[in-house]
Structures are given as structure tokens and as C-alpha cells.
Amino acid sequence: MHKFLTIIVLFFILSSSAQKTKIPVHAWMGHSKEKTDKELKEQFKDLKKKGIDGIMYNGGHDPETYRRVGKIVKNTGMEFHTWVPTMVQGKNPKLKEEWYAVNGLGESAFDKPAYVDHYKFLCPSREEVYNFLADLYGSIAEVEEVDGIHLDYIRFPDVILARGLWDKYGLVMDREFPQFDYCYCDVCVADFEASSGVNIKEIKDPSQVEEWKQFRYDLITDLVNRLTEVVHSKDKQINAAVFPGPSDAKKMVRQEWNKWNLDALYPMNYNDFYLEGTKWVGDITKEEVMSVGDKPVFSGLFICPNPEKKISEADPENHGLLPEEIEAAIQESMENGAAGICLFTPGRMTEAHWKAFNKAIYKNYKKNK
């Protein structure tokens, strides 16, 4: 009898040790106004079955949208975070044109946005901007079904584009150019002069003034940390999509995100944008994890929607990880300390992607030292 019990115990021990732990997986998703509750339920059930644990949902500014969709997501057993852009805001009766950022040529992001029409960035130095955002995120955080607020575009416009995007815009960004350098509005210029004694408009090459860079890092950091207080007062989490680094993030979009008081970070480790392979994903993840200590880092992975056309596709925004690369990208992320991954997006995943993904998420990854 004792021998039989010993065999049973050993069997369960061996079975338990053989079981592979599933890694946490979140995903960025856009809102579909046309879908019924039934259709959304089926979609979310399918994503849960495929291994998604949390949804970062972009549904606009209306709390009722998140109440409706959040209830469905929560009923499928997934986390529900609201993905709401921060500094990028289109025309809105609640926002005045003078609250938008101004570049080194004196052009407003409202009238003449950089790169693409939707790059209408607000200025983080304006108290009115903070009030608008605090009201927006505070109202959404009050929705019972919401687990957390997910910030995006919490930055300045790209003063330096990722290398893989240069050809798309016909640019060589080997230095900072004034038309992409923000913000030179009267408030920012006056506040910087008050704190440093320097009138930045009188400087021939502002990119050489480190205090001016730090001033703008701090503007974003202070705004984030104030918004954190708002969201935490509602007993909700707050996290953000950020550029890789934070070394690259600082140089490119003025994000010094290792100083942000968030509950988690979601760096967009989109290797194709940087003309890099999956090894780079691991290297940058290691930097990110080390920069924030014990704070969770979810490695954002950019998926190629049409793998068979990637080589012939000119637009890098249609590039991304191929099915045969996704396992390596996940492995590099997890072995270098990521708490999990975040997919951009489930809708870009092919059947071949899902097959490789399923194999990769049920593994015990050993952290690199």
C-alpha cells in the first residue's frame, strides 16, 4: 500500500514539474462600432482561447463604450485596459488651438503637424491640457469594468524617426531638425528661461543644450506622474506604451520613462522599424527591464499581416514579425526579463503566426543573467 502511494505521489510530482507555465500575453485592439455584443463576445472568447490574457482597447473618449465592451471582456476572463492616446488629440471643442505644441520654426502642431495629419500634439506645459486629460482619464477610470488606463502618444513628436521609417518620409535624420523639434510655444520658452536663465530661441543650435532636453523630458514625466495620481485615486492601474530604451525613447521622443510612476510599461519593441532582427528585441528588453527594477515590462511585438508580401512591401508599417520569427522574439523578450508580451495586433496574426505563438507561450523561460 505504501509503495503504491509513493508511486502515486511521484507521478503527481513529475507531472507538475513537466507542466509548462503560460507566459502573460496582452494585445492592443481597436474598437469596432459595427460589431454586436454577440460578435464581440465570440471575438474575445476566441482570443482568450488562443492565449490572450488582457486587452488594451482603443475605444475613444466615451466611458460608456468601455463599460459595454469591458463587461464582455471581463466575462471571458481577460483583463481590460483602456488604450487612450494622451498628447495626440484631434479637433475638439474642449481644446483650444493655442494649447497645441509649436516646433522650432514656430509652426503649430494643430495647423501643420509633422509627418502625418493626425500628429496634432498638445503641449505638456499647459495646465489646461493636464486638466483636460485628468478629467478624461478620471472619468474612464471610474468605469467598474476597467482594470487600468493605458496611455499612448505620451510624448513629443519624433524629433528623430526610427531608422526604418526614414525612406518612407524621404528623410535623413542624422540630427535634430527644427520642423520636428517641439515645443517652442511662449509658455515653454518662458518657463525654461525662468528656470535656466536661457532664452532658447536665441540659441543657434538648441539640440546642443542638454538642459533644454531635460526640461522637456521632465514636462512629460511630471504630466505622467500627475495622471498616475488621478487614476490611482480611482483604485485603478495605469500603464503606457512607450518607445524602446529608455535610451532610444529619450533621443527620439523625449520620453524618460524610467522615471514614470506607472504600474507597468509596454515598450514598442518593433524591430523592423529599427532595421534589426529578433536578437535586438532581447537586447533592448534587457535594457528596459534593468531601467525600471521590479516594475513589469511587457515587450510589444509588431506583427507582419501579410508575410508572403513582406519583401515587396515598401511601407515599413506593413512589415513586422514573420511566423517563423515570433517564437524567437518571444524567447528573447522573456529570457531578458520581460513579464510578458503585448501583440500589435491580434488582427495582424495569420494562422501560421498563431501556431508558432501557441508553441512559444507555453514554455518555461530561463532568465539571462
Regions found by a protein language model. Name each.
Residues P267-T278, K295-K369:
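Substrate-binding cleft of secreted/luminal carbohydrate-active enzymes
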Residues G70, E79-V143, P316-H319, E324-A329:
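Active-site-adjacent "subsite" loops/lids of carbohydrate-active enzymes
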Residues I23-M29, I55-Y57, F80-V84, I149-D152, ...:
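Hydrophobic faces of well-ordered beta-strands that scaffold small-molecule active sites
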Residues Q43-L47, D53-A101, E211-D235:
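Aromatic-lined substrate-binding rim segments of carbohydrate-active enzymes
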Residues K33-P63, V143-G148, W257-L265, E332-G340:
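Catalytic domains of carbohydrate-active enzymes, especially glycoside hydrolases
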Residues Q19-Q43, A240-P244, C304:
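Boundary/entry segment of secreted carbohydrate-active catalytic domains
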Residues V9-A18:
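Hydrophobic h-region of N-terminal signal peptides that target proteins for export
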Residues A114-L262, Y270-T278:
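Polysaccharide-binding and catalytic clefts of secreted carbohydrate-active enzymes
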